[in-house]
Amino acid sequence: MKAAISLLLLSALLFVVIEAITYEEGKELFQGERTDCVGDGQRCADWAGPYCCSGYYCSCRSMPYCRCRSDSGK
């Protein structure tokens, strides 16, 4: 019984690690496809582009006037 539980826990842990790696790789690929990124203070739209470059996030205080803001200033 202990062996079965240990095997089950090991399998679950292995699955979580593999999924985390797959998610990070997919995220990197998606970021690589974002060639039309804009920087600080420029207009952006997370749902359709242009997207904010790495280190920025799209802040929409009043639609449709969304602007890229620095991640460090959150």
Curated annotation (Swiss-Prot):
Q: Which residues form the propeptide?
A: 21-34
Q: Does the keyword Nucleotide-binding apply?
A: no
Q: Which residues does the record list as Serine amide (modified residue)?
A: S72
Task: Describe, from its UniProt entry, the tissues in which this protein is expressed.
Answer: Expressed by the venom gland.
UniProt xrefs under SUPFAM superfamilies:
omega toxin-like
Q: Which GO MF terms does the UniProt record name?
A: sodium channel regulator activity; toxin activity
Is Secreted among this UniProt entry's keywords? yes
Q: Which InterPro entries match?
A: Beta/delta-agatoxin_fam
State the UniProt keywords alphabetically.
Amidation, Disulfide bond, Ion channel impairing toxin, Knottin, Neurotoxin, Presynaptic neurotoxin, Secreted, Signal, Toxin, Voltage-gated sodium channel impairing toxin
Q: Where in the cell is it found?
A: Secreted
Where is the signal peptide, in residue numbers? 1-20
User: Which Pfam family is one of those matched by this entry?
Assistant: Toxin_7
Tell me the domain of life: Eukaryota
| Cysteine disulfide partners in this protein | C37-C53, C44-C58, C52-C68, C60-C66
Q: What does this protein do?
A: Insecticidal neurotoxin that induces an irreversible spastic paralysis when injected into insects. Modifies presynaptic voltage-gated sodium channels (Nav), causing them to open at the normal resting potential of the nerve. This leads to spontaneous release of neurotransmitter and repetitive action potentials in motor neurons.
Name the family.
Belongs to the neurotoxin 07 (Beta/delta-agtx) family. 02 (aga-3) subfamily.
Q: Domain comment, in the record's words?
A: The presence of a 'disulfide through disulfide knot' structurally defines this protein as a knottin.
Protein name listed in UniProt: U3-agatoxin-Ao1d
Q: Which organism is it from?
A: Agelena orientalis (Funnel-web spider)
